[in-house]
């Protein structure tokens, strides 16, 4: 019976400690970023670089479409290209063996 009571108290202490630690994490404040434009941005309005690239700083637009184009979407900004860099050519030949003698 003593072991059961000990284990129950240990479990309760662990649960309580986890809950208290969780409250501490939730109480931290985060830095406030500038608000993202609701629908469109026009020249003369403030632009925060944290919103991403301002792909057309000369006309009003939303994230992808310029208002001056009307319903024509052929010149819309496609967004950032998320391809990784090509680090190695898989078809490249292996390097030649080192010249000279060796053990």
UniProtKB/Swiss-Prot annotation:
Keywords on record: Cell adhesion, Fimbrium, Signal, Virulence
Chain segments carrying region Disordered: 61-103
Self-association state and partner proteins as the record states: Forms a homomer composed of subunits assembled in a large structure.
Highest taxon listed in the record's lineage: Bacteria
Protein purpose: Structural subunit of M.tuberculosis pili (MTP), which are thin (2- to 3-nm wide), flexible, coiled-coil, aggregative fibers. Has a strong affinity for laminin but lacks significant binding affinity for fibronectin or type IV collagen. Mediates adhesion to the extracellular matrix, an event that would facilitate direct interaction with the host epithelium during infection in the lung or other tissues.
Main location group: other
Compartment(s): Fimbrium
Upper lineage: Bacteria, Bacillati, Actinomycetota, Actinomycetes, Mycobacteriales
GO cellular component terms, A-Z: pilus
Biased composition (Pro residues): 92-103
Organism of derivation: Mycobacterium tuberculosis (strain ATCC 25618 / H37Rv)
One BP term from GO: pilus assembly
Transmembrane feature ranges: none
Name of the protein: Pilin
Family statement drawn from the similarity comment of this UniProt entry: Belongs to the mycobacterial pilin family.
Compositional bias ranges of the Basic and acidic residues kind: 61-76
Induction comment: Positively regulated by PhoP.
Coiled coil: none
Stretch forming the signal peptide: 1-30
């Amino acid at each position: 019976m003593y072991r059961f009571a000990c284990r129950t108290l240990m479990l309760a202490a662990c649960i309580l400690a986890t809950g208290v630690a969780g409250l501490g994490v939730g109480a931290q404040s985060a830095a406030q970023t500038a608000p993202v434009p609701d629908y469109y941005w026009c020249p003369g309005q403030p632009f925060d670089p944290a919103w991403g690239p301002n792909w057309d700083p000369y006309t009003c637009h939303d994230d992808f479409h310029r208002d001056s184009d009307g319903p024509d979407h052929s010149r819309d900004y496609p967004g950032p290209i998320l391809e990784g860099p090509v680090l190695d050519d898989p078809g490249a030949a292996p390097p030649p063996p080192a010249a000279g003698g060796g053990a």
